[in-house]
Amino acid sequence: MASNQHIGASNLNENEAILTNRVAELERRMSMFEGIFHALSNRLDLHFKKYDVVVNSQQQQINELTAFLSTLLNDQQRHAEILSEKLSGTLHGVSATSISLSQTLDPQGFTDGTTAPGAPRNYTSVPMNNDQTAHPQNEGAVSNETLFEDILNGNSQENDKSQQQTNSSNSISQENNSTNPSVDTRFNKPQNYNSNLVPSLEEYSANPPNNDGGQSQGLYISSNSSQSRQSPNLQKVSPNHENAVESNAQESVPTFEEEQYETKTGLKRKRIVCTRPFEFIKSPHSVMEVWKEYTEGVNGQPSIRKMEALYQTAWRRDPAVNKRYSRRKVLWKAIQTGLNRGYSLNYVVEILENSRYVNDKQKVKQPIGWLCHSSHIPETLK
């Protein structure tokens, strides 16, 4: 019995040892798996963070690219609109020029006398005028045929009537030939032609002749009295038009001009175009010079305030001009602030001039460029 109990106790001890070893092995494996799981989770977290950074950077780049493309498309659309406006303005100018030239070269513009205000004017071409001159000749031909038939029939009275009709048709054709000359005599330049008094195409597009319905203007002026007596129809130039042509010939090329086009309601302004770059005062010596440049203009140029009102930013597209404008804008704004607060112009200029002094005893001043920085503007003018 004692031996059996001893054997049973030893077996229990062995089983407990085996269970303990298995439990320890399982705990070790569980801890190992837990460590592997934590390592994998940490690694996944790192990968997720990297992916988030990459996705955010890509999204930012996509947003920047989208903004750039939208800006580029807007600029292209605006440029296309500007080009279309310029093209339409050019077409309007060409059409207005052709209309004014057709009115200028109208044969009725070289005839004497005035027509009624409500009377329509003839703007037909040369072939139609030739048809009109040839029409009385056709009537004369018909009258000759009737005359031949009347002679065959022996009707003397109808013969006299047909002869009267023939004479009247010939007189009408001669009058038409005198009033409406041929193409060669009508459009050839006379000997007293003066090229300085003929306005150019640009002048007719900008200032087309007024259609007053009764008084037409000629293009040529006779300088010889005998020739003027022989061709009185060529002296239909009004004194206002002559003075305008001579003044346009004497004036130089304008700096600032307006593009105009003609519509059904009259001549309208298209837009104002700046034809030369703006020149700032180089190294101004006082604040008053800078202010006068902004408000009054110098060297025959308009004021910068007027340039901004007319052209916005179109007049300072040059980088150098835009940079100088941005620097001096600080000084103009300071003066305007002082004026808005009720200070006089002389007082504001005196404050700015006093702030330029480096040494009051030697009267040494900083340049105007130093004063164009916002940090150097006095506090009372900020």
Swiss-Prot record:
Keywords in alphabetical order: Activator, DNA-binding, Nucleus, Transcription, Transcription regulation
Span list, region Disordered: 104-138, 155-260
Keyword DNA-binding among UniProt keywords: yes
Domain of life: Eukaryota
Biased composition (Polar residues): 104-114, 122-138, 181-198, 207-221, 232-253
Residue numbers covered by motif Nuclear localization signal: 266-271
GO molecular function, one term: sequence-specific DNA binding
Biased composition (Low complexity): 162-180, 222-231
BP GO annotations: cellular hyperosmotic salinity response; cellular response to heat; cellular response to methylglyoxal; positive regulation of invasive growth in response to glucose limitation; positive regulation of pseudohyphal growth; positive regulation of ribosomal protein gene transcription by RNA polymerase II; positive regulation of starch catabolic process; positive regulation of transcription by RNA polymerase II
GO cellular component terms given for this protein: cytoplasm; nucleus
Region annotation (Leucine-zipper) ranges: 12-26
Misc remark: Present with 491 molecules/cell in log phase SD medium.
Function description: May function as a transcriptional activator. Increased dosage of MSN1 restores invertase expression in yeast mutants defective in the SNF1 protein kinase, and msn1 disruption reduced derepression of invertase in the wild-type. May affect SUC2 expression. Expression of MSN1 enhances growth in iron-limiting conditions.
Protein name as it appears in the record: Protein MSN1
